[in-house]
Every structure is written in C-alpha cells, then in structure tokens.
Amino acid sequence: MINIEEQTTTNTVIFLGAGISYVAGVPIQSEILKTICNNKEIFYSNNGNIFIKFLKDNFGLNENCDNLPTIEEIYSFLDFFISQNENLNSKYPVVKLKNIWNIFTQLICSVIETEVYVGNKADNAYNKFWQKLVELNHKISIITTNYDSCFFESFDNLYSQNYLLNYNIDFANYYDEYMRDINSFFWWDKAEEGVNNTKIIDVYKLHGSLEWLYCSNCNKVMHLPFFHANYNLENGELKQPLIFNEKGESIQRIATCPVDKCKYQILIVPPTYNKNFNNSILKDLYFKALLKLRMAKNIIFIGYSFPDADYHIKALFNRVNMTRKNVVVIDKFLDDNKKRKYLSICNHVKFKEIAFENCIDEFTSYLSD
C-alpha cells in the first residue's frame, strides 16, 4: 500500500483566510457586526430592525452601536436556547430565536456582498498571484473558509491556458435537467484532469460559498460563477438572480431548484462555535481537504487568523502528520496569540509578517521542492 505521506510528487496546499479578501473590500469578521449596524439600508429594513432590537434587548446595545458583542457571542447565545428548544422569555420564544438566527446569517451574507469592491489593487494582486501559482511545477490545491469568491473570480484569465478550478462538488450545473432553461452564463465546465490538455487546481471551500445555491430536497448545489445571490432585507426571501438575454430582457429566475421547484438556500456555515456539519456535501469537502493536506509537502497559510470558533480547522490539522511539512504563515498582523495557535498544530512554523499583496514576488522562496 502506498503511504500518501511518502509520495514524491510536490503537492502544495494554500490555506486562504479573510486577509486575502480584505484587499478587495470584504470586511474581516471583527468588522462585520459594526458594518451591519452602520449600514442604513439594513438598519431601516424590517429584518435589520428585528436584529438590532434583539441586540438592544439582550446585549445592551446603545444608540451609537459602539458596545457590540462578538459574532460568536451572539450565535452562542442563540444556539443555547435553540439547541435546548427553550424560550428565552415571552418576548423571544424559540421560534422567534430561530428566525433571528436566520436573519443574522442573512445579514452577514448581505454585508459581505454589498461591501465588496474589487479595485485595481485587488485585481492586479490576484492576477499576479494566480500566474505565480501556475508557473510552479507543483500540484496546487486551495483550501479556504471564506464565503466570498473575490480571489477565484480573477481566475478567468487562466482559462486560455487550459486551467480549470475543481470545487470537488458534483454541481447541478453538470446535468441537463438542471440547466435546460438556464442561460449559458451559468454553465460551469466539469474539471477533468488531462481532458483536452486541461490542468486542474483543486479548491475546497469548507464553509461554503455565497455562489452556491443549495436544494435540500435533491441535495444538489447550483454554482453561480461571477454572480452572488442575496437576501431580501424585508422578508428574508432569497433574491432571485436575474438572467438577461441580448436585449436586456429578464428571461429566467433560479432562486428555486429547476427540477423540484424547492426554494434554494445559500450554502454556508455561519461563524458560530456550534457549527453544523451534517450537510453531506460540506462533510465530504472536509475529508477531501484532509486527504490533500496529508499529501502536501508545503502548507502555506495566507491571511488566516485561526478564530476560536474554528476549532474544527485545528482538528483538521491535528489529524495530519505535520512533522515533515514545510509550513509557512503569511499575515500582515501577527501577534503572540495568533502565533501560539499555529504552533499548537506544528512546532516548526515559519512566520512571514507581510501583507498578501507584498509577498507575491518572493512567494516561491517559501516553498520546498
């Protein structure tokens, strides 16, 4: 039997955190709640009002919204009552708490979507980094906990070089019955190594994606490349992405599954301590990512802060023999606490205190062949 830890192929896994999306305008987790409270569209919406009233009643939020709890505190508070199926009080029965939990998740999605602005700085850095990766004589895999796809949207420049992204999910996009009435803009080529000289970069989005619409009835995910679904702030309904023909006319809405007509949900794992990985698609991604890590010679972290709620990520690496791995952490803001978390999974980590956009030129020097 081949020991995957002893294979000779140079496999490099890059683990991307929020820091790589920050340059594109995506708020880091510690900024999301403040952004929610300062966003006028959210603040004056029905669901925004429900959520902020909940914070005032249970976390003492003041009028200036400058005494905010953490995201994890809010989710943990809600999870306590929901998991026990208990009311908080007469004002907040468990059914209302479940609704607030959903509203909070929807607001996080909305903030990430509306705050994104990919300027030249992000475009140039992303394109340059992708080109650097494909020039390596390595098998590249990317693992990320980010919901957004700012970094991956810049990959389209590599299609002409026969590169494809493989998200390791059997997307509904691959099946005619799902795509029969869907505009070709949402077609997604199935990544198969070697077909028409195709070269594959594997991607594992462990916390899901804002581009993934999930049908819980048929257990299929529709991938919406270069389009981001969003929620109606008044009623919580998933906004239906419009597809337009050459005349600019709306011809299709796909917020419901084309096959069984059930409502789609965005497939993400919220930043809560009590993460639910019962979804078979995300569970499968987790174990596929574990296999890639075991095969890797290089593991490069970029902009990942190792938040306390990501205990499952620590567990992921604790299941890997890190002894012979070349492990590098690239982060603009490295403090002792963050270093301690990394050293708990590997005692020979190399720390590079540098911003993502400034590390690209010397990136190859971080790798072992």
Question: Model-flagged regions — what are they?
Answer:
Residues 1-24, 29-40, 46, 53-55, ...:
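SIR2/sirtuin-family catalytic core signature
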Residues 1-153, 159-163, 360-362:
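Gly/serine-rich nucleotide phosphate-binding loop at the start of the catalytic core
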Residues 54-94, 133-269:
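Extended, H/D-rich, highly charged conserved domains that either
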Residues 87-94, 110-118, 248-255, 276-281, ...:
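Phosphate-binding glycine-rich loops and adjacent basic patches that engage nucleotide phosphates
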Residues 113-115, 173-179, 271-273, 299-303:
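N-terminal start-of-chain detector that recognizes signal peptides
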Residues 119-128, 181-190, 238-242, 274-290:
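A Trp-anchored, charged/polar loop motif used as the substrate-binding/catalytic surface
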Residues 101, 105-115, 257-272:
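Active-site-proximal helix-loop elements at catalytic-domain edges
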Residues 91, 99, 226-253, 291-294, ...:
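Repeat-unit-sized solenoid/scaffold elements
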